[in-house]
Amino acid sequence: PAKPPYSYIALITMAILQSPHKRLTLSGICAFISGRFPYYRRKFPAWQNSIRHNLSLNDCFVKIPREPGHPGKGNYWSLDPASQDMFDNGSFLRRRKRFKR
């Protein structure tokens, strides 16, 4: 399968926006991406590290700690409210501008 034309930021944003609570764990984000794009089913470890790196590096993603009493691994990730419209008209191919918190 061919590599999708989307940046990692776009892939992460797609995953978060489709989730019911608009937040996902790293594993939830990776599950969405590999489920939607066959290209990412093969090279799992390498691109998962890129997803992790992009979550930590970009201000448009916000880490949300797990609530006490909710077992599981890892924090949740969501979009900073000010960055919700960073993709023009829902097109994930182009970002409007860099987002800074």
Curated annotation (Swiss-Prot):
Residues within the DNA-binding region(s): 2-93
PROSITE patterns per UniProt: FORK_HEAD_1 (PS00657), FORK_HEAD_2 (PS00658), FORK_HEAD_3 (PS50039)
Annotated keywords: DNA-binding, Nucleus, Transcription, Transcription regulation
PANTHER family associated with the record: FORKHEAD BOX PROTEIN, FORKHEAD BOX PROTEIN D4-LIKE 1
Species of the source: Rattus norvegicus (Rat)
Primary localization class, coarse: nucleus
SUPFAM superfamilies: Winged helix' DNA-binding domain (SSF46785)
Organism lineage string: Eukaryota, Metazoa, Chordata, Craniata, Vertebrata
Subcellular location, record wording: Nucleus
Alphabetical list of InterPro entries matching this protein: Fork_head_dom, FOX_domain-containing, TF_fork_head_CS_1, TF_fork_head_CS_2, WH-like_DNA-bd_sf, WH_DNA-bd_sf
Name of the protein: Forkhead box protein D4
GO molecular-function terms, A-Z: DNA-binding transcription factor activity; sequence-specific DNA binding
One GO term describing the cellular component: nucleus
Pfam family, one: Forkhead
Cysteine pairs bridged by disulfides in the record: none
